[in-house]
Amino acid sequence: GWHDWYQSANYLVNPEDGEFPFAGIEPIGVPKALAGTAIPFIYEDIKNLKKLIDEHGEDVAAIMLEPMRSEFPRQGYLEEVKELAHKNGSLLIFDEVSCGWRMSVGGAQKKIGVTPDITAFAKAMSNGYPMGAVVGSYESMEPADRMFVSSSYWSDNIGLSASKATIEYLLSNNSEKWFEDYGNTLKKKVTEVMDSSSVNVKISGIPSGPIIQFISEESSEIPLMKTLFVQEMAKQGVHMSTVFHPTMSHTEEDIDITVRA
């Protein structure tokens, strides 16, 4: 489901700095004919996207992106992307593998109010069990009936059962409000600790996915600070990155343990 890992994406580089997103990765074994069939664009830079569409025109089959991560996009951005896509005869596809379900049953698109043609969901949808879903409008999905689609695990019902149970639980327990309240409490307590330290750091982002941001005039220091943070938190028994992913099984005690660490 995640759009960035098409085979052709192995040839992509960050359009802002020309670097591949993962150090040490090469497009080994990927046919050279696929190079250039996926084109990266800069998130929230609508001029950059429009320029690419003007250059490639009807060759653009779809615009695919994560609608958001830890921060909401600027107001109107996704509406503009959808308008550009449809004006060009292209599909709009959202990757909600990470941002879907925690924020809202229905995904970030429900919160933001922009419905794409196709969406990929996974992860929180099934509470960690292996499960993914590709959903969309009839017009977008109907061609699959004329395509070769196969699977080795058609009969696996565990992921389906886990997803059904998870979605029912989220709906019956007002998950949107729970994540809002829990995330804001977490951010408040972590901020108090940060404010009392000598480290230039802050916590920001939406309540369902707060993110710790280290600040330094030397950009090369930031990855080292992140690594040190993860290492020292692990020593205190808290296994995490610099992004929090609350679940409804977490308690106030878990926040206190994190803050003490």
Regions found by a protein language model. Give the residues of each.
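Helix C-cap/helix->beta junction micro-motif
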Residues: 87-89, 197, 236
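PLP-dependent enzyme catalytic core of the Aspartate aminotransferase-like
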Residues: 171-173, 232-261
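A short glycine-threonine-serine/GTX helix/turn-capping micro-motif
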Residues: 50, 146-156
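PLP-dependent aspartate aminotransferase-fold enzymes
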Residues: 1-59, 184
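Structural signature of PLP-dependent enzymes
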Residues: 166-188, 219
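Conserved PLP-binding catalytic core of the aspartate aminotransferase-like
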Residues: 183-187, 191-229
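Active-site PLP attachment segment
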Residues: 112-144, 155-162
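Active-site core of PLP-dependent enzymes with the aminotransferase class I/II
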Residues: 48-52, 65-91
